[in-house]
Every structure is written in C-alpha cells, then in structure tokens.
C-alpha cells in the first residue's frame, strides 16, 4: 500500500513538472518592452551591407520585425522560463556607429537581464560609455574587431559577474584600470592589438580564476607584476610585442596549468628562470626578440609536453642544451641569432617529432650531425652563419624524406658535396653558399631536386663552370637562383631555346666573370630581381631590359658599361604599362654623356644610384618636373655634372647625394619642402650660398654635408633636433658661434635620454619596409686624409667645422653633446679657452682643434674621456699642465707642438719617445711620424665604425629576399654596449 502511494506521488510530480515546462514553452516568451528596446538599439546604428564579411549570408537583424517573437530573432536568446532577453549577439552584423551613454541598451531597464553582449566584428567607433555598468548581470562582453577608442572605463570593475572579456583589435588606449581586480570571476581577458600603455596593475593578481591573459601588440611597459604568480589557474599567458622590461618573474614557475607562454618582442633581461622547468603542461614557450642572457636551463628537459621552443634573437650563450633531447614532442626549435657555442649533439634524432630546427647566426662549430637527416618529420633545417666545419654528410637518408628547407650557407664546410643530397627530392629551398668544395662540382646531382624553388650555390670555390642554360632547363619550379662568386657561362652551347628555360623571379650572378649581357634574360618575363654586378660586361645596356614587365630591381654596378640603348625614350606605346622598375644601381661603370632621360619614364623608381661614373652635363630637368611619390634615394656622386640643382626635386626623397661634381649656384630653396629628407650631401662642388638655415624645418634631417664648396657668411643658432652628422668644412663660413649654438641638437645629447629604444623603432625602421638596403656613404676629412664611410651609421655622430674662418670661443653648449664621436674645429680662428664642458663628451673618439688661436689650459676633464683615441691641439697658444690620462699619453708629440706654454710629465713622456719637444715647431716632422699619424687616425675611425653596434642606414627596400652582400652589414661594438636592432 505504502509502495503504491509513493509511486503515485512520484507520477503526480512528474506530470506537474511536464505541464509547467509545456506551458513555459508554449507561452509568448518575449516581453514587448524588451522587443522594442532591442529594435531601438538596432536603429541607433547604420547598416552597411556593402562592407559585410559575406554578402551571401543574411544579416541577423533581417529577422527582427515588430510582429514576431524576439526570442526567435537571430542573435537573441531568452531565458526559457521567464522570457527575458539574456543574450544579444550582433557579431558580423555590418553595423557602424557610436555606442552612446544614453543608448537604449543602458537606459531601458528591460535589458538589465543581459548576460552576454557580443558586438564583435563590426564598425563601432568611439569610447565605451561608463553606463555599461548598468548591465550588472553580464558574464560575457565581446567588443573585439571594431574601431573603439579611448580608455576602458573604471566602472567596468562593477560588472562583478564577468567571466569573459575580449576588447582585442580596436584602438583603445590608456592604462588597464586597477578596478579590473574586482572581477573575481573572470576567466578570459583579451586586450591584444590595441594602443594600451602603462604598467600592468598588480591587482590583476586578484583574478584567481583567470585562465587566459592576452595583452599582445600594445605599448605596455615596466616590469611584470609579481602578482602574476598568484594566477594558479592560468593556462595561456600572451604578452608579446610590448615594451616590458626587467626579469621574467620566477614565480611563473608556480603556475602548473600553463600551456602557452609568449613574451616575444619585449625588452626582458636576465636569465630564463630555472623554475619554468616545473611547468609540466607547457606546450609552447616563445621568448624571441628580447635581451635574455645565460644558458637555456637544464630544467627544460622536464617539459615533456613542449611542442614549440622559440628563443631566437636574444643573447643566450653556452652550448646546445643536451636536456632538450628529452623533449620527444618538440616540433619547433628556434635558436636563431644568439651566442651559442660548441658542437651540435650527434644524437639529434632523439627529437623524433622535430619539424623545424633553426640555429642560424650562432657560433656552433664541428660537423653537422647526420642524425638530423634521420628524423622523418623534419621539414626545415637552417644553420646559416655559424662556424660548422668538416665535410657535409647526410647519413642514411631514407628513400623518402620530408625535408623541404635546407640552409647551410656561410659556414666552414669543405670537401665534395655528397651525391646523397640528390635523395632530398622534396627540397624547395637549398642554400650551400660559401661551401669550400675545393675543386670540381658535379652540378647534375642537383638535377634530381625537381621541387626546388630557391637555390643558392654562391661562392662554392669551385673551378667548374656553371652552364646557365643547363641550370634553367633542369628545374621547372625554380623561382630564385644565386650563383654569385662562381664562374658562370651565359652562352647557349646547346640546342635549347629560351622558351624551354624556367621563368624565374630572382637571379643573382654577381662576380661570375660574365663578359657580355646575358641574352636569355630577354625571355624572362617574370623576372623581378636581377643582379649582374661585379662582372666584366662591356658595351651598352640593352633597351629591352626595361621592357621586362615586372622587373623592379636591377644591379649593374661594377662593370664596364659605357651607355644605354634608347637613352632618351623607351618608346612606350599608349597602351603599354610603364616599367615597374623600383631600384636601379649603375655605380662604378664607365657611363658617359648626359644622364639618360628615360629615367623620367620610370614612375615607380625609389632608388637610383649612378655614382662613380663619367656622366656630364646638367641633371635632367625632367627629374625636377616629375612629382614621383616613390623616389627616396638619389645618388649622383662622383660624376662630372655641372649646372644647377633642379629647383623642384622629388618631394619624397630621403637621401640626396650629389657630392663630387661641378654643380654651381645656390641650394634650391625647394629642398625645405622635402619633409622626409634625412641625408643631404653636396660636398666637393662649386655651390656658393649662405648657410641653409632654412633646412631647420626638415624634422627628419640627420646628415648634412656641405664640405668643400664656396659657402660663406656667419651661422646663427640652428634647430637641427635630429642632426647626427654635419660636415661644413672647407668653406668660407665666418663669424662667432653663439654660446647656445648646440642647445637644440638633441639627437647628440644622449641616445638613452632622447630615444625610446625599447620598441626598436629607430632610424632604420623609418625607411625600411622589407629586406633590400640602400647604403648612403660620406667622406670624412682629417689632416688632409679622406676616408669614405660606405655606410652611414645611426650611432656615428660627427661635427666637422674645420677649414673655415670662425672666430671667438668654442660654444660652451658643446658639452651637451654626450653622444658626439668626432669633433673637428681645426683651421679656423677660434680663440679663448677650451670649454671645460667638453669633459662631458664621454663618447668622443676624435678631437681636432689645431691651427686656431686657443689659449689657456687644456681642461683636465678631457683626461677622463676613455674613448678619446685621437687628438690634436697643435698650433695654438695653450699653456699649463697637460692632462695625465692614458689617452693623452698615447698621442704623438706633434699633436701638441707650437704651444710653448704646455708642460708636465705626460708631455715629457710623449716627446721623449720621439726625441723632441713640442716647442720644436720649426722642424719638419719626419715622414715616418706623418705616416704613423695618418695610420693612427685611419685606424681610430675604421676601428670605431667596425666596432659600432648595428649600423642603421637610410634605406629603400622592395623585396623579402636579401642578397648575401647585404645580409650582415654591421658588427657589434665590443667596447660599448649599444643596443642592436632585431633581425
């Protein structure tokens, strides 16, 4: 009886529950007030159907009508029991407009039950109104991929139920509000791809349930808060591409659930914390492009789930970490651009799932482990620019290899190339450049590589002549070929027609002993890049070259060309597209006559180098008439050009060099309109003008060279805030230099104080978009010795006012220029005392104030300038004790001669070495001493240049591939720790 009663009661409860659910599902769910509020919200914005992501997909709002239940509208979800709208999803709805504080979304209480608001992937603008806090039940807020701007309102801290927040891919700025710490239920927080700045608030450590933190691609700075170590549920920590500094917190090693860490492109220093080896769930660790030192911790051998390890472009040292061989799941290992040494382990095949191994630009030695070629999954091996040596062996390559990229260039391999390389039939990229083959090479071994697209066999040190027709007929997919430095035959010795040759896009034949212009090029309709520099090609450049439809980089430098076919007109018809030429290098040839006017028919030209030829006549007037939006570098130096500089020159120029010609007249005032101009060099001409003070309006001007002309008159206080090199020597400037003359030359004050180097946005980045560099050069004059600097370096700062008629005292403001390296004020009429403020020039390496009327003592402060390698105080009226610094004691006696009042132990030591005193000014210096001085000066300057950290140039670049002769243009300064720019 009791059992039956219980069963009946249970059935009654089930029936009532069913009826309740049935009633809920059949009644009208959407409250009309909520429906009206949603429609009002939609009408606040413009719908742009033409800019929709997919015009074939109907818009969500098309189903929103007055006579239908809003709970069935697309993007709307209602509470099943009470009918309240709880989710509003308008993602991908092609909406444009501003989210106002009085929007119905916040103003009307009918929408207060919303838990999800998704406005992602639209075109919303403006700021987030603080009235957002009225949606107090929100758990999900997604505003990603719009154009929102401004700051995150601090009122967001009142949305205490938030679990998911995504503001990525907008234009937000400002700091993260500390009120974020009140969102105690938050699990995912994404601010990536915005303009946020400031420090990450320590209150972020209060988000104890956070699993995902993404702050990448912003401008956050400062150290990471140690409170990050309290986020014990964190799985993804993505902080790349910011300006974070300091050490990586060791407390991150406590976050045992972490699967992904990405800290690349910041300014972290110190060592990788050993504690990170405790992260047993970690699958991806990316730390590239920082300033990390030390070794990869041996504890990383415990990360048995690790799939990606990328520590490229740091300062890591030590040997290859053997512990990494325990990582059986590792697929990507990038050690590129560090300071790792020693040999690579022989048992690399332990990394059985490895797909990419990149150890380029380190200091590895020893043989290449053949075990690498026994890893079936391996697709990419890049080991360029190391010191690997021995013969190149490929081990027991299986009949089927997955290897697609093998780059071993610029090592010390020697011996024959093993035929087993022909088994790598899936290779798409092969670089064996600078391989010392020590004899003949059988190039047929490469003919089996039918998939090859990129082939670099430059500088193989072989006596074999490479037949271009055989090479181009063997590879049907070849796109880039570099045979530079090898002997190449471009003559068709077979029955092959040009139509049977593969059409490639990039060809490098520099220094190949070629004597005639390659005729097969005429049919290369897909050619983008052509380098036939450093050969022995004579005659004229064929006119058909400019008709190749997509050719945009040509290097003809260092040949013996004498002219151009069709030098006046290209002969384009009205329906032909103009040539695509962007960079043209023709320096160091024997071109004569006028500059060809067809240059003006190349509307996309960005770099033109005609330097070191025999062009004469005037610069074509058409170069002044064409308003090219592309031309950035124009180099006409060392020719025989005459006449005036064109009044209207290209307004997009970054670098203009017309030095060593016979130009006359004045500098065209239109130069002041070239707002992008960074380098102006008119040295060694016959220009007669006053100092171009009007160039102060050029905010990007960094190099100004007026030396050896006929400039005249006084110079007033200038405003060159970015000037790094100024050479006005050998002119007729006169007058006094005001005491505050240098106060606005802030670029020479201090790199640390005036430039934010943390983001890497320095001189090179302003002018470079890819990897082709154009180098500016200049000439320094000192004591009659000219030295040509082939590259203008960002950290190289020079002031040369020598050989003029300046009077008065050296401006005391010279002491502000703490980053000045070369100062030459010689051969003027300067008087008074040498300013003691010159003791502040801590970077100074060369000082010449000879041949003036300076009096008083040499400031003792100069003895503390530890980098001062060359100095000359001769032929003045100096007196007193010579400073006793080491740098003074290494100078020549002649550096102080004709200063009868100088004395002291340092002077006696210097002059006793050479058997004379500085008072013997009437005696001619011995030739040996002159030679030693010249050699000392050259060594000082060249030593500085070669030792300077990462030279940065004015550049014009067009392609993604980098020629060998541009790959490593600069070396590090071992004496001075100046930061470098990333690869």
Swiss-Prot record:
Top-level division of the source organism's lineage: Eukaryota
Glycosylated residues, chain numbering: 66, 102, 137, 158, 171, 190, 195, 206, 254, 278, 347, 389, 396, 402, 456, 461, 492, 498, 555, 558, 590, 616, 734, 744, 824, 872
GO CC terms: plasma membrane
Parts of the chain on the Cytoplasmic side: 959-983
Location relative to the cell: Cell membrane
Membrane side Extracellular: residue ranges: 26-937
Signal peptide from the UniProt entry: 1-25
Entry membrane topology: Single-pass type I membrane protein
SMART domains (UniProt xref): LRR_TYP (SM00369)
LRR repeats: 82-108, 111-135, 136-159, 161-183, 184-207, 209-231, 232-255, 256-281, 283-302, 303-327, 328-351, 353-375, 376-399, 401-424, 425-448, 450-474, 475-498, 501-524, 525-548, 550-571, 578-602, 603-628, 629-652, 654-674, 675-700, 702-720, 721-744, 793-817, 818-840, 841-865, 867-890
Transmembrane segments: 938-958
Record's keyword terms, sorted: Cell membrane, Glycoprotein, Leucine-rich repeat, Membrane, Receptor, Repeat, Signal, Transmembrane, Transmembrane helix
Family, per entry: Belongs to the RLP family.
Protein's name according to its UniProt entry: Receptor-like protein 19
Name of the encoding gene: RLP19
């Amino acid at each position: 009886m009791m059992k039956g009663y219980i069963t009946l009661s249970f059935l009654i409860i089930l029936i009532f529950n069913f009826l309740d659910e049935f009633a809920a599902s059949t009644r009208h769910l959407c409250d009309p007030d909520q429906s009206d509020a949603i429609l009002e919200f939609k009408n606040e914005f413009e719908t742009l159907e033409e800019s929709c992501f997919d015009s074939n997909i109907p818009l969500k709002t098309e189903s929103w009508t007055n006579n239908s239940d809003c709970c069935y509208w697309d993007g709307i979800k209602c509470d099943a029991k009470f009918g309240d709208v709880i989710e509003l999803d308008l993602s991908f709805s092609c909406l444009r407009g501003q989210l106002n504080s009085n929007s119905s979304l916040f103003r009307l209480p009918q929408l207060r039950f919303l838990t999800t608001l998704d406005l992602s992937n639209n075109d919303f603008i403006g700021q987030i109104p603080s009235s957002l806090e009225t949606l107090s039940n929100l758990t999900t807020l997604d505003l990603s991929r719009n154009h929102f701007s401004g700051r995150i309102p601090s009122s967001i801290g009142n949305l205490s139920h938030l679990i998911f927040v995504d503001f990525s891919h907008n234009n937000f700025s400002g700091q993260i509000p500390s009120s974020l710490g009140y969102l105690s239920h938050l699990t995912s927080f994404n601010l990536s791809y915005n303009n946020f700045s400031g420090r990450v608030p320590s209150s972020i450590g209060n988000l104890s349930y956070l699993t995902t933190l993404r702050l990448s691609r912003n401008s956050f700075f400062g150290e990471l808060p140690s409170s990050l170590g309290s986020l014990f549920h964190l799985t993804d920590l993505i902080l790349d591409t910011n300006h974070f500094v300091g050490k990586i917190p060791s407390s991150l090693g406590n976050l045992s659930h972490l699967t992904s860490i990405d800290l690349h492109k910041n300014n972290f220093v110190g060592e990788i914390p050993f504690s990170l080896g405790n992260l047993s769930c970690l699958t991806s660790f990316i730390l590239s492009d920082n300033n990390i030192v030390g070794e990869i911790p041996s504890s990383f051998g415990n990360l048995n789930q690790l799939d990606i390890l990328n520590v490229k472009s740091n300062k890591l040292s030590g040997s290859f970490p053997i512990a990494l061989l325990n990582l059986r799941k590792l697929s990507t290992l990038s050690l590129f651009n560090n300071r790792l040494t020693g040999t690579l382990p022989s048992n690399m095949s332990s990394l059985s799932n490895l797909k990419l191994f990149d150890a380029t630009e380190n200091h590895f030695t020893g043989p290449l482990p053949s075990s690498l070629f026994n890893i079936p999954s391996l697709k990419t091996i890049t080991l360029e620019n190391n010191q690997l040596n021995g013969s190149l062996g490929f081990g027991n390559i299986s009949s089927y290899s997955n290897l697609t990229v093998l780059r071993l260039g610029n090592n010390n391999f020697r011996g024959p190339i093993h035929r087993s390389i022909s088994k790598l039939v899936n290779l798409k990229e092969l670089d064996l450049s600078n391989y010392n083959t020590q004899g003949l090479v059988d190039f047929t071994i490469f003919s089996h590589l039918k998939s090859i697209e990129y082939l670099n066999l430059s500088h193989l040190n072989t006596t074999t002549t490479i037949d271009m027709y055989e090479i181009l007929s063997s590879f049907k997919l070849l796109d880039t070929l570099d045979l530079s430095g090898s002997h190449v035959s471009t003559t068709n010795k077979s029955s092959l027609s040009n139509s049977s040759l593969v059409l490639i896009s990039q060809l490098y034949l520099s220094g190949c002993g070629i004597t005639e212009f390659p005729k097969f090029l005429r049919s290369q309709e897909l050619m983008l890049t052509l380098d036939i520099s450093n050969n022995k090609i004579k005659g004229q450049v064929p006119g058909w070259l400019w008709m190749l439809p997509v050719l945009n980089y040509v290097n003809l430098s260092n040949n013996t060309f004498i002219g151009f076919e069709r030098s006046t007109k290209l002969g384009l018809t009205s329906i032909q597209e103009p040539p695509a030429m962007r960079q043209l290098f023709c320096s160091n040839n024997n071109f004569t006559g006028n500059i060809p006017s067809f240059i003006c028919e190349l509307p996309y030209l960005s770099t033109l180098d005609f330097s070191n030829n025999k062009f004469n006549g005037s610069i074509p007037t058409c170069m002044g008439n064409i308003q090219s939006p592309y031309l950035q570098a124009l180099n006409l130096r060392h020719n025989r050009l005459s006449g005036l500089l064109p009044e209207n020159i290209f307004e997009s120029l970054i670098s203009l060099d017309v030095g060593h010609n016979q130009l006359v007249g004045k500098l065209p005032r239109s130069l002041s309109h070239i707002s992008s101009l960074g380098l102006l060099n008119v040295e060694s001409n016959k220009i007669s003008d006053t100092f171009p003070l009007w160039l102060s309006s050029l905010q990007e001007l960094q190099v100004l060279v007026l030396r050896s002309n006929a400039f005249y008159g006084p110079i007033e206080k200038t405003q060159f805030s970015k000037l790094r090199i100024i050479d006005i020597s050998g002119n007729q400037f006169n007058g006094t230099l005001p005491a505050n003359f240098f106060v606005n030359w802030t670029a020479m004050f201090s790199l640390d104080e005036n430039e934010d180097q943390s983001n890497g946005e320095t001189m090179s980045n302003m002018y470079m978009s890819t990897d082709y560099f154009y180098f500016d050069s200049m000439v320094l004059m000192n004591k009659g010795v000219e030295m040509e600097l082939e590259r203008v370096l960002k950290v190289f700062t020079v002031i040369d006012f020598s050989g003029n008629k300046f009077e008065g005292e050296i401006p005391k403001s010279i002491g502000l220029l703490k980053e000045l390296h070369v100062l030459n004020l010689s051969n003027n009429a300067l008087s008074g005392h040498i300013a003691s403020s010159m003791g502040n020039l801590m970077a100074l390496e060369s000082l010449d104030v000879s041949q003036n009327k300076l009096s008083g003592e040499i400031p003792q402060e100069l003895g503390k300038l530890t980098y001062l390698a060359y100095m000359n105080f001769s032929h003045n009226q100096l007196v007193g004790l010579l400073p006793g610094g080491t740098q003074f004691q290494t100078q020549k006696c002649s550096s102080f001669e004709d200063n009868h009042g100088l004395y002291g132990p340092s002077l006696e030591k210097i002059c006793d070495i050479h058997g004379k005193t500085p008072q013997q000014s009437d005696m001619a210096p011995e030739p040996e001493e002159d030679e030693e001085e010249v050699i000392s000066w050259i060594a000082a300057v060249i030593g500085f240049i070669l030792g300077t950290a990462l030279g940065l140039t004015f550049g014009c670049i067009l392609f993604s591939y980098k020629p060998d002769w541009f790959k490593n243009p600069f070396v590090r300064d071992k004496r001075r720790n100046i930061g470098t720019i990333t690869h």
